[in-house]
């Protein structure tokens, strides 16, 4: 019977290389979102800051595909929950997942998967734009839902969690679409 390392070396070299490349892509995707989270702008009358996270979530999902985007954003959440300062403004911990911004954070993996599933390698401009818009809607649905749950007032949650971000997020959807279309041929993990 061979040593355990013999089992690992039996996989064909291209499979090992592809798996390693995929792990690197997922890790880079998580780090891109972590860096984007550090760009924060406080918004009056809401506990939710404006960040570049949603833009990064859409781009990571669009470039890595549904499974890769889901894995990258799940990794991102795990890093933050483990105490690494990857959430907005260098924060971390479970308090951010159960607090006012938690709904957005928990929606990120789903949004990345939606973008990746709909904005595949052959998707044109319109399909990619719609994928990004739908994914942004997923992010806002999660965020507003958690704000409503915590505050008990759905109308106030909508005013605090969606209205101040609408215009900026339209721009992020357009920019994400352009970045996905411009970069996806360079990323092998795109579906």
State each model region's role.
Residues 42-114:
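Alpha-helical membrane segments and adjacent membrane-interface helices in multi-pass membrane proteins
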Residues 2-15, 35, 94-139, 147:
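Short helix-perturbing small/polar motifs within transmembrane alpha-helices
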Residues 27, 31, 35, 59, ...:
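Generic alpha-helical transmembrane segments of integral inner-membrane proteins
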Residues 63-67, 114-122, 182-187:
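Structural signal for the C-terminal ends of transmembrane alpha-helices
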Residues 23-28, 55-59, 69-75, 101, ...:
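Hydrophobic alpha-helical transmembrane segments
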Residues 122-191:
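Membrane-embedded alpha-helical hairpins and interfacial helices in multi-pass inner-membrane proteins
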Residues 37-44, 83, 88-91, 119, ...:
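Short helix-capping/hinge motifs at transmembrane helix termini and TM-loop junctions
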Residues 2-70:
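Hydrophobic transmembrane alpha-helices
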């Amino acid at each position: 019977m061979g040593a355990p390392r013999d089992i690992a070396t039996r996989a064909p070299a291209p499979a090992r290389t592809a798996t390693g490349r995929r792990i690197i892509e997922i890790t880079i995707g998580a780090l891109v979102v972590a860096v984007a989270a550090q760009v924060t702008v406080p918004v009056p009358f809401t506990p939710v800051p404006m960040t570049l996270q949603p833009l990064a979530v859409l781009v990571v999902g669009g470039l890595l595909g549904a499974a890769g985007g889901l894995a990258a954003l799940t990794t991102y959440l795990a890093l933050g929950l483990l105490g690494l300062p990857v959430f907005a403004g260098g924060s971390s911990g479970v308090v951010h997942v159960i607090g006012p911004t938690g709904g957005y954070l928990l929606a990120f993996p789903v949004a990345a998967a939606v973008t990746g599933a709909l904005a595949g390698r052959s998707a044109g401009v319109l399909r990619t734009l719609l994928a990004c818009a739908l994914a942004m809607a997923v992010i806002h649905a999660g965020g507003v839902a958690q704000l409503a749950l915590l505050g008990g007032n759905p109308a106030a949650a909508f005013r605090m969690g969606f209205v101040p971000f609408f215009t900026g997020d339209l721009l992020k959807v357009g920019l994400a679409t352009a970045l996905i279309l411009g970069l996806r041929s360079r990323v092998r993990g795109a579906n």
